[in-house]
Amino acid sequence: MENKVVEEKQVDKIPLMSPCKMGKFELCHRVVLAPLTRQRSYGYIPQPHAILHYSQRSTNGGLLIGEATVISETGIGYKDVPGIWTKEQVEAWKPIVDAVHAKGGIFFCQIWHVGRVSNKDFQPNGEDPISCTDRGLTPQIRSNGIDIAHFTRPRRLTTDEIPQIVNEFRVAARNAIEAGFDGVEIHGAHGYLIDQFMKDQVNDRSDKYGGSLENRCRFALEIVEAVANEIGSDRVGIRISPFAHYNEAGDTNPTALGLYMVESLNKYDLAYCHVVEPRMKTAWEKIECTESLVPMRKAYKGTFIVAGGYDREDGNRALIEDRADLVAYGRLFISNPDLPKRFELNAPLNKYNRDTFYTSDPIVGYTDYPFLETMT
């Protein structure tokens, strides 16, 4: 009898380990790999060491969102990030995607344009970066706490140029499907190009892409529509961060912005909407705040993913309280390739080393974090 009780206890699943239907995808658990820039794609081409990195973090029926992947030459703002605008890049992604699928994982490619978060050294022919504005960013201390990132004042896109950028997102989505990805996540967060258009503290336009909330969100929604029409809405997700101030992109009414976006997204029947918690105002700073994603969660009619400083207890609570369908983990997944298993067993976690997040080493801090079985 004692053995039977033990066996029953073993099959009791925590909320994070319960199955979830995400549109046409059947997920076996709710622990999602968040998109994580690692700067190990030399020359903007995905590398063979990424095969092991993503394979290590793949589980049967688990959702992985790939690192931010640049859609065009003008979208670059960091060294050694992957792209998906050339045939060579598409081919380089294929074995990485295959490795995830071999483990039964579901893999989305996050498609990205940095906008003004760049300088002319990254841009084709040394041109100025592009944005919704011509106001530049102030220099920033990089994540290593030493180097200073300098940004070239951007060139304001003309109204007639914007459809070309929308088209670049569409083509990138098509390329991602050609590479074998199950879908794409449109990067509309963290002060990059789409977020620059959405946020009223950045967007100072007077055309149909600026001013009102509807106008500021027009660019994002045109991209959603173009990408959904190209690859099918059930293969499209979007990430937004209405409350964040990353890269000097804040909004005076983030609650209204977030609600407008999710209500507008409802008509597209996307795979999911992925939202960064209000408590994550900047990349590394988790703060106490009274703002909540609950109104957005209630307004959105599809699968709702939350991210931002979650741990096991916090993630389970979000699911129990119906504040989310899925929970995305970043830093904990970097240092714990078997994070879902550790959560399931309530096992101790490896500590992450922030110093190796953005180095170019193909092993250290990338594929060398130990699994549970190698620690016993």
Swiss-Prot record:
CDD domains: OYE_like_FMN (cd02933). It catalyses: (1S,2S)-OPC-8 + NADP(+) = (9S,13S,15Z)-12-oxophyto-10,15-dienoate + NADPH + H(+). Its EC number is 1.3.1.42. It is an enzyme of class 1 (oxidoreductase). SUPFAM superfamilies: FMN-linked oxidoreductases (SSF51395). Pathway: Lipid metabolism; oxylipin biosynthesis. It is found in: Cytoplasm. GO terms for molecular function: 12-oxophytodienoate reductase activity; FMN binding; oxidoreductase activity. One of its GO terms (cellular component) is cytoplasm. Its main location: cytoplasm. It holds the Pfam family Oxidored_FMN. This is 12-oxophytodienoate reductase 1. FMN binds at residues 35-37, 68, 110, 239, 309, 330-331. Constitutively expressed in roots, leaves, cotyledons, cells culture and to a lower extent in flowers. GO terms for biological process: fatty acid biosynthetic process; oxylipin biosynthetic process. Belongs to the NADH:flavin oxidoreductase/NADH oxidase family. Induction: Seems to not be influenced by wounding. The lineage of its organism: Eukaryota, Viridiplantae, Streptophyta, Embryophyta, Tracheophyta. Its cofactor is FMN. It comes from Solanum lycopersicum.
